[in-house]
Amino acid sequence: MHFHERFDVIVVGGGHAGTEAALAAARMGSKTLLLTHNIDTLGQMSCNPAIGGIGKGHLVKEIDALGGAMAIATDYAGIQFRTLNSSKGPAVRATRAQADRALYRQKIQNILQNQPNLRIFQQAVDDLIVENHQVVGVVTQMGLAFESPAVVLTTGTFLSGKIHIGLENYSGGRAGDPPAIALANRLRELPIRVGRLKTGTPPRIDANTIDFSQMAEQKGDSPLPVMSFMGDVSHHPKQISCWITHTNEKTHEIIRGGLDRSPMYSGVIEGIGPRYCPSIEDKIHRFADKSSHQIFIEPEGLNTNEIYPNGISTSLPFDVQLNLVRSIKGMENAEIMRPGYAIEYDYFDPRDLKNSLETKAINGLFFAGQINGTTGYEEAGAQGLLAGMNASLQVQGKEAWCPRRDEAYLGVLVDDLSTLGTKEPYRMFTSRAEYRLLLREDNADIRLTAKGRELGLVDDARWAAFSEKLESIELELQRLRGQWVHPNSPLIHALNPHLNTPISREASFEELLRRPEMDYSKLMQIEGFGPGLEDPQAAEQVQIQVKYSGYIQRQQEEINKAVRNENTGLPLTLDYKEVPGLSNEVIAKLNNHKPETIGQASRISGITPAAISILLVHLKKRGLLRKSA
């Protein structure tokens, strides 16, 4: 049975990747269908109730700069906001928000339901329709076929998902949801490498049974940050505290005593877990010399008693979970509302993807999110936006687009995945980016919004606000460069008390701002130098561009050198055995990875600069040198 309409783009799955993919394709004018097994869980925060953090917050800002929904929803759902690394340089500062699960889900669903060109339909997908290596549609659980030349799969942990609590296990996509078994079996028939990964979640605790007086209170920042470039503090709901406690030796003894019934340590779980978000069992095993581990006590919302104890993700049996929770200070009488568990699921080797996130094997089939081996809402949302956008571009007959590594963390993420692959759940850190001084949270819109507008992702309201901000920054920079003060002027007499070394020569306002002891707000408060910019985002941009101009210029020069051959394209049909001079190891690796560009090839382990030179000579001789989009 065929559905009565055709669609330009079909998105399968309604998590963080799926919602951003569907919204992106629809914003670009494509007739889009979002298929989900349950409309009520669209935008669900399946694990921790938080958005952002180091590296992750950068991705959220990039999603926002390209017109995505995650940052906006966070501003409406965030019940605590903090700027991490606030005492460090701007490159590594990151915004993190504790979110009310219900408010976040409601806001995402509201955005989806009001998006033109987007249809939502509740049905699980069991099959793909593929003809001559081209996807042409999907088939749902009830046998209903939907036709489309572009399909984005955002299946999360649902592909052959198996939930483990102790030595007991059962099939599930996440707690309370069925797995996608038929679709997983269908995907295993495709010529794409498949593996198993695992992730986990902690038990949820009843707040009424916690003694918060024994814990350290952690308040949010003041003044309050916002997540979206279009956000405002007035969008935030009521702000509340989180709390901090610690495990202890008794906790660790309880965990060690239960390891014989741990699915991880008894060989029941085959999948590899996230290195940077390990289970409490893993922490005790890997860091045996540590006598305690920090636990963040995070409220799940304003109208629920559920608490998320961040730091004790576990798949131990329930009796062990209860004992370990009650061994922790402040939780001696705690009651568990939901047990912690681990979940194993299928993922597909992202080296089998183009950097558009389209599969190399099947035209029109795109993957985004945990299906590609990543972990985290932010990583999923960023991939979803890129996949939905490129699916729409393909339907429109336009070239795919992906930012370079020096343009966005999204570019770093996709390049790492498609070039290097991953054997464990991949999460983003600022340390993964070579050019992080240019890839700051604060300038994500300056880096990406113009491109987003060109692609059709950015609406008129965002574009107008961005254009106004850019103009105000440029005018203020011109003012600071163009206004000068003499050492004997009244302005200097007012300024000198604020300086470590008095001004002894004529100086521009820009030079004064560049001094280490001076910042923009302080300078603007001194009579004769203000009033300055009212928009805090624009003011921050002015300060960073002035103070870091030398470093930024040097990093830009490094990038210009590096990208000379970065985008030189490599034919996917090229058999590297035909390239004379390459070693057998290099031939095997290049034929295995099938990199799209010289830049990707150069980042494959074992590919030497000499091999790259040989490749370039071969391409030139054969007339195959071309620049990738």
UniProtKB/Swiss-Prot annotation:
Superkingdom classification of source: Bacteria
GO CC terms, sorted: cytosol
PROSITE patterns given in the database record: GIDA_1, GIDA_2
Binding residues annotated for FAD, in chain numbering: G13, G14, G15, H16, A17, G18
SMART domains in the record: GIDA_assoc_3
GO MF, one annotated term: flavin adenine dinucleotide binding
Location of this chain's protein in the cell: Cytoplasm
Database matches in SUPFAM superfamilies: FAD/NAD(P)-binding domain
Pfam family, one: SAM_GIDA_C
GO process terms (BP): tRNA methylation; tRNA wobble uridine modification
Keywords: Cytoplasm, FAD, Flavoprotein, NAD, tRNA processing
Signal sequence annotation: none
Chief location bin: cytoplasm
Residue sites binding NAD(+) per the record: 273-287
Cofactor: FAD
Keyword ATP-binding: no
Xref: NCBIfam families: mnmG_gidA
Annotated family: Belongs to the MnmG family.
Quaternary context: Homodimer. Heterotetramer of two MnmE and two MnmG subunits.
Record's function text: NAD-binding protein involved in the addition of a carboxymethylaminomethyl (cmnm) group at the wobble position (U34) of certain tRNAs, forming tRNA-cmnm(5)s(2)U34.
Name listed for the protein in its UniProt record: tRNA uridine 5-carboxymethylaminomethyl modification enzyme MnmG
Organism, scientific name: Shewanella baltica (strain OS223)
Lineage: Bacteria, Pseudomonadati, Pseudomonadota, Gammaproteobacteria, Alteromonadales
Gene name of the encoded protein: mnmG
